[in-house]
UniProtKB/Swiss-Prot annotation:
Taxonomic lineage from the root: Bacteria, Pseudomonadati, Pseudomonadota, Gammaproteobacteria, Pseudomonadales
Alphabetical list of Gene3D superfamilies matching this protein: Acyl-CoA dehydrogenase/oxidase, N-terminal domain (1.10.540.10), Butyryl-CoA Dehydrogenase, subunit A, domain 2 (2.40.110.10), Butyryl-CoA Dehydrogenase, subunit A, domain 3 (1.20.140.10)
Origin: domain of life: Bacteria
Record: active site: 243
Binding-site residues for FAD, renumbered to this chain: 269, 280
Species of provenance: Pseudomonas fluorescens (strain ATCC BAA-477 / NRRL B-23932 / Pf-5)
Gene this protein is translated from: pltE
Keywords: FAD, Flavoprotein, Oxidoreductase
Name this protein carries in UniProt: L-prolyl-[peptidyl-carrier protein] dehydrogenase
Cofactor list: FAD
Family (UniProt): Belongs to the acyl-CoA dehydrogenase family.
């Protein structure tokens, strides 16, 4: 078993580190409160918006493991996790369903624009009364005589929605089949009957604007359906595999950056005539941070390796997602405690990691739902 990166993976990681240090860090962005078009353009130029999109459509054509390694480098080098999240949601929850389930014509039309960043993608599945229970959708899509669909519904917490050009969304087409009667669709921002709210104020990932999406007699051409009618559950689960693995690789990078900062602080901050790291209470917290990081890394790479072998096992992906989510939150709390009052100041960046890590336990499937998936896969 070889734990080393290959030459291509090393090259991508080094390139991303350079882009983060030389270009993204210079953007400032007022403590990462707002989305900026300049940062998005930099990501597009660097290929960060199409890591897993095939080369024939302008992407990098990376497999799951290489994509995760690249996203780890992105989260390690970029202090604006909202931007990282926006880029990840764009390609894993929006572009990848199009890669895997759209028609050849739609792929040729949409994917190059997503890979370059000309189009911004959003995934809209969550509803006011359908969060974790994503199969209980109230949104409906009715087939029309001309082959199109009439879409009505209300989506909430859609990442990138206020700035998106393309939406991947889901609606019930055959209610008598329950979860097997859901279909996936691509909806363009210019579609009549589509309306998006102003950005929602939230505690975490602020530079990735989230909003509500309303479909009111919105017409969607049949060519914009993803896969067959009733295949929406498969489309969504596939996209969640990519998102739970490769998006969360970025938060593994954040955990590593956080650990490096905390170790440096513990070595240089002196109290009672010695570095605070000499105190067992501090050093043991840092040891736990390291344990969480390395355990999560192994689970992540195992899950991504399986995806590349054609085995997107839900068990390994859920284990990885849960380890990173809970590990990031626990380590962020430890980091704030070690930094003390400075950990509560925006200028040190530690409080932002704590806020952003709260979100990791909720989006892309809550930690409670990951426990449920793990228990189900163990036949409990």
């Amino acid at each position: 078993m070889d734990f080393n990166y290959d030459d291509t993976q090393k090259k991508h990681a080094a390139m991303i580190a350079q882009v983060c240090a030389e270009q993204l860090a210079a953007c400032g962005n007022e403590h990462s409160r707002y989305f900026t078009a300049r940062q998005w353009a930099i990501c597009g130029e660097a290929g960060l918006l199409g890591l897993s999109i095939p080369r024939e459509y302008g992407g990098q054509g990376l497999g799951a493991l290489s994509t995760a390694i690249a996203m780890h480098a992105f989260g390690l080098g970029c202090t604006d996790m909202g931007l990282v999240f926006a880029a990840a949601a764009h390609q894993f929850a929006c572009a990848m369903p199009i890669v895997e389930f759209a028609t050849a014509e739609t792929k040729r039309d949409v994917l190059p624009k997503l890979a370059s960043g000309e189009f911004i993608g959003s995934n809209a599945i969550t509803e006011p009364e359908a969060g974790s229970d994503s199969s209980n959708l109230k949104s409906r899509a009715w087939p029309q005589a001309d082959g199109s669909y009439r879409l009505d519904g209300h989506k909430s917490f859609a990442g990138n929605a206020p700035i998106a050009d393309i939406f991947v969304t889901y609606a019930t087409t055959q209610p008598e089949y329950g979860a097997l009667g859901v279909s996936g669709f691509i909806v363009h921002r210019s579609s009549a009957g589509l309306r998006v709210s102003e950005p929602l104020d939230k505690v975490c990932l602020r530079s990735c604007p989230a909003g509500e999406v309303f479909f009111d007699d919105c017409r969607v051409p049949e060519v914009n359906r993803l896969g067959e009618e009733g295949q929406g559950r498969q489309v969504f689960q596939s996209s969640m595999g990519w998102e739970r693995a490769c998006l969360f690789a970025a938060f593994l990078g954040m955990m590593e950056r956080q650990l490096e900062q905390t170790i440096e602080h513990a070595r240089t901050r002196r109290q009672f005539g010695k570095p605070i790291g000499d105190n067992q209470a501090v050093s043991h917290r840092i040891a736990q941070m390291k344990l969480r990081l390395e355990s999560a890394r192994l689970l992540l790479f195992r899950a991504c390796w399986g995806m590349d072998q054609g085995d997107p096992g839900q068990l390994n992906i859920a284990l990885s997602k849960l380890a990173i989510s809970e590990g990031a939150l626990a380590s962020s709390i430890d980091a704030v405690r070690i930094f003390g009052g400075r950990g509560c100041l925006e200028s040190f960046g530690i409080e932002a990691m704590l806020r952003d890590s709260i979100g990791t336990t909720i989006f892309s499937g809550t930690s409670d739902m990951q426990h449920e998936i793990i228990a189900r896969e163990l036949k409990l």
